[in-house]
């Protein structure tokens, strides 16, 4: 499926890829109040406003998501500018098929 800005990320395929990739980190870039309402199990919360605090090796596989995919796309661009080499935008949490953790 193609959106206004090209192909939409395949959330579930990228989540599976993250689970299979050694050392991968799934990051929910929404605000803490959004995160506690429900998030992908195993994900951590680093809001877009604090993405500059990411303290991983530059080659760590990072998988980002948010409510619509916009904030995660912005965070991905920031991390890439900071030299992170393996960052992927998973897109919107609404594409997640499973039980959310609270």
Regions found by a protein language model. Name each.
Residues 2-25, 31-61, 70-102:
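Rhodanese-like catalytic fold shared by cysteine-dependent sulfurtransferases
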Residues 65:
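Short, surface-exposed ligand- or partner-binding patches at beta-edge/loop junctions that are enriched
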């Amino acid at each position: 499926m193609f959106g206004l800005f090209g192909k939409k990320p395949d959330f579930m395929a990228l989540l599976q890829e993250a689970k299979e990739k050694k050392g991968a980190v799934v990051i929910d870039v929404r605000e803490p109040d959004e995160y506690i309402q429900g998030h992908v199990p195993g994900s951590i919360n680093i809001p877009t406003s604090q993405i500059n605090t990411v303290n991983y090796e530059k080659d760590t596989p990072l998988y980002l998501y948010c409510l619509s995919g916009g904030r995660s796309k912005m965070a991905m661009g920031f991390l890439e500018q900071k030299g992170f080499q393996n960052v992927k935008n998973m897109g919107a949490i609404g594409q997640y098929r499973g039980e959310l953790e609270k």
